């Protein structure tokens, strides 16, 4: 099914390391990590791109994040949304279109203006811009005012679509502009 699409993007909500899924400080706190072999299933299922724009890609610090990107690169999986570097944008060409992927993580990014500038730049240089925004409240089936306000600012800055994640439930869709 996934292979029938021109591009398929997956939100990788955790690291890909050899670590155990336990906090180093408190054994009662789970930290999300996957065995590297799990990426073989991601690749074989047909996913092309992985979003790392979420609140669990830092569960094992910068070292765990770098191990994750190394594991992705070993399987030729493209990625975007560096938890530690707000300036990253992924651009891929597909069927003659330049498509930009910009990650936004409510829990990591400190410089919101920089995110808007990245979207503007991506819009000026590419045909399509997708913003993957990791934001909102867990288990709420309707987006909050923060999500709506920021998603609209992303669109106003040049994004063609904003895809949200984090709440663990399906939320509403808004057609804006």
What name fits each language-model region?
Residues 1-177:
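Acidic, metal/ion-coordinating pockets
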């Amino acid at each position: 099914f996934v292979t029938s699409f021109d591009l398929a993007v997956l939100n990788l909500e955790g690291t890909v390391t050899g670590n155990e899924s336990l906090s180093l400080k408190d054994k009662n706190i789970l930290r999300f990590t996957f065995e590297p072999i799990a990426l073989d299933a991601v690749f074989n299922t047909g996913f092309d791109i992985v979003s790392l724009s979420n609140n669990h890609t830092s569960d094992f610090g910068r070292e765990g994040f770098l191990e994750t990107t190394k594991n992705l690169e070993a399987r030729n999986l493209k990625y975007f949304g560096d938890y530690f570097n707000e300036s990253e944008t992924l651009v891929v060409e597909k069927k003659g279109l330049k498509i930009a992927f910009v990650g936004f993580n409510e829990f990591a990014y400190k410089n919101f203006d920089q995110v808007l500038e990245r979207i503007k730049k991506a819009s000026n240089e590419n045909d399509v811009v997708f913003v993957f925004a990791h934001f909102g409240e867990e288990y709420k089936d309707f987006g909050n005012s923060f999500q709506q306000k920021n998603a609209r600012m992303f669109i106003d800055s040049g994004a063609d679509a904003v895809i949200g994640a984090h709440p663990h439930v399906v939320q509403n869709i808004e057609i804006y502009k």
